[in-house]
Swiss-Prot record:
The keyword NADP does not apply. The keyword Ribosomal protein applies. Gene3D superfamilies: Ribosomal protein S10 domain (3.30.70.600). Belongs to the universal ribosomal protein uS10 family. This is Small ribosomal subunit protein uS10. The lineage of its organism: Bacteria, Pseudomonadati, Campylobacterota, Epsilonproteobacteria, Campylobacterales. Part of the 30S ribosomal subunit. It comes from Campylobacter fetus subsp. fetus (strain 82-40). Involved in the binding of tRNA to the ribosomes. Disulfide bonds: none annotated.
Length: 103
């Protein structure tokens, strides 16, 4: 396996950064090289709802949801690297997308 790309997404950036630090530490212990973490643009989803169920259209509330993302590239991954990644206990709030890349 030549290269592994990890894309991590979470609503809380602190949990995301702790997870990224744990992954980087585990990968470096196996001797593989890590590129990143690269902070990706934060996606903001905004929702506007009426405060009143009947009248007063001018009275509204706005909510937003921020999705933070990081990207890691693991270069020269070994079977030990893949093994250590699968054994990691990651936070359930973090969405991890793993993709094996060629050269």
């Amino acid at each position: 396996m030549e290269r592994i790309r990890l894309k991590l997404k979470a609503y809380d950036h602190r949990v995301l950064d702790r997870t990224v630090a744990a992954i980087v530490e585990a990968v470096k212990r196996t001797g593989a090289d890590v590129r990143g973490p690269v902070p990706m643009p934060t996606k903001i989803k905004r929702y506007t709802v009426l405060k009143s169920p009947h009248v007063n259209k001018d009275s509204r509330e706005q909510f937003e949801m921020r999705i933070h993302a990081r990207m890691l590239d693991i270069v020269a991954a070994t079977p030990d690297t893949v093994d250590s990644l699968t054994k990691l206990d990651l936070a359930p709030e973090v969405n991890v997308e793993v993709r094996a890349m060629g050269k």
